[in-house]
Design a protein with these regions (language model features):
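Class II aminoacyl-tRNA synthetase catalytic cores and aaRS-like
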Residues: 1-279
């Protein structure tokens, strides 16, 4: 039994190594073609994903104000379907005549390729949004690059917002730029990141995969910002105090000890900030 488990784990590791090799080969091919994503240092972003949805909802409400919803009462299934389709196409034509152009950037977390058109989900700091990628809109070469891209790659997308037939606000891509190539494989999306040890040791993966963890960090950042603003408005001054000290006092806790090579002396991790603030 142990031998079977070891063989299975070895096979899985071999598969992972092969996938990692493929990703590095894709990067090498991009670099040889003069499309090294790591050479791109700036990309103009006009909106976050949540901003796009808010902007489109407001624009839609303005353009379609007073337009009643389609009434399918008394229609059979086929007639109702045609009425809903006609209403959608009319609404879409009104919105497309005065489109909302946006530019976003984020990590691709999902991709579904369907011949000449594809869908993907782009995730940024404030959420995620679906993008619609058509070969005729972005060109054959770029579409081929997109089809070869992997989950975890970071894309810049320029286009206009629209609402799909299912009601989801999306972006119709007109320009796309591969900003960064993901060389590592993200955990499987459905089950998420459940390994507690990995979540703490590789916090960056936790922030990518778990929305709840990211929200905690965002809230923490906002709280610290408000505390700083509150104190700064009252003429408090922020100062830095030493983190490594010769004598860690102020409490009975046992300090962490290490050796400072540059000074050739033993130091301790501080316990209390109060002692230095009082000096």
């Amino acid at each position: 039994m142990a031998g079977q488990n070891n063989g299975k784990q070895g096979g899985q590791q071999q598969d992972v190594n092969q996938l990692l090799k493929v990703r590095r080969e894709k990067l090498a091919n991009l670099q040889e073609a003069g499309q090294d994503p790591f050479q791109i240092t700036k990309y103009d972003v006009t909106h976050h994903t949540s901003d796009v949805k808010e902007l489109y909802n407001a624009h839609e409400e303005k353009l379609l104000a007073g337009r009643p919803a389609v009434n399918t009462d008394g229609m059979d299934e086929a007639a109702a379907r045609e009425a809903v389709k006609a209403d959608y196409e009319e609404r879409r034509s009104i919105m497309d005549a005065d489109p909302v152009h946006v530019s976003i950037a984020g990590r691709m977390m999902f991709k579904r390729v369907m011949g000449k058109a594809s869908f993907a989900n782009i995730q940024d700091l404030k959420g995620s949004i679906q993008i619609y990628v058509a070969r005729d809109a972005i060109g054959e070469d770029l579409y081929a690059t997109f089809k070869k891209s992997d989950i975890g790659d970071i894309w810049g997308v320029k286009g206009y917002a629209f609402r799909t037939k299912t009601g989801e606000i999306s972006i119709h891509a007109e320009e796309m730029t591969l900003l960064s190539k993901s060389l590592q494989i993200l955990p499987e999306k459905f089950h998420g990141l459940t390994d507690t040890d990995m979540r703490y040791r590789q916090r960056y993966i936790d922030l990518i995969m778990n929305q709840e963890s990211k929200e905690v960090f965002v809230k923490r950042s906002k709280i610290l910002k408000e505390i700083r603003n509150f104190l700064a408005d009252r003429d408090f001054m922020e100062v830095e105090t030493p983190m490594l000290v010769a004598n860690a006092g102020g409490a009975a806790a046992r300090p962490f000890e290490t050796h400072y090579n540059a000074l050739n002396e033993d130091v301790k991790l501080r316990i209390s900030l109060e002692l230095y603030l009082k000096r």
